[in-house]
Amino acid sequence: MSWQTYVDDHLMCELEGNPGHHLSAAAILGQDGSVWAQSSAFPQFKPEEINGITTDFNEPGHLAPTGLHLGGAKYMVIAGEPGAVIRGKKGAGGITIKKTGQALVFGLYEEPVTPGQCNMVVERLGDYLLEQGL
């Protein structure tokens, strides 16, 4: 299965119990910031934005004072799982990032999708990739 298939079928899929609702954007990146696959609406990001995210996984709390930036948008960092999941909020939407052994799995959402729905979609794929040694 290609990485694009994981994005299209497992991240950008219709949400269970919510016909017509799905994440607004998603991607799978290598921990070096290389794009493995992304949805068409995933924001153009800067290398330093990914560096900040990877630093926060290694040093939890790094992004809290400045916020998480992706594609020029600033997200307020909210409770995540140190070293495993970063969650951010921006207005009526937000972001969930799950770290696996080799990748970063991104999901972005806007209302009516809830933070919990985004977390479930992103973390389920991230957990699967971890189980596969990826």
Curated annotation (Swiss-Prot):
Pfam family, one: Profilin
GO molecular function, one term: actin monomer binding
Compartments, record wording: Cytoplasm, Cytoskeleton
Gene Ontology annotations for the cellular component aspect, listed alphabetically: cell cortex; cytoskeleton
UniProt KW keywords: Actin-binding, Allergen, Cytoplasm, Cytoskeleton, Disulfide bond, Phosphoprotein
UniProt-listed InterPro entries: PFN, PFN_euk, PFN_sf, Profilin_CS
SUPFAM superfamilies cross-referenced by the UniProt entry: Profilin (actin-binding protein) (SSF55770)
Subunit text: Occurs in many kinds of cells as a complex with monomeric actin in a 1:1 ratio.
Database matches in PANTHER family: PROFILIN, PROFILIN-5
Role summary: Binds to actin and affects the structure of the cytoskeleton. At high concentrations, profilin prevents the polymerization of actin, whereas it enhances it at low concentrations.
Protein name: Profilin-2
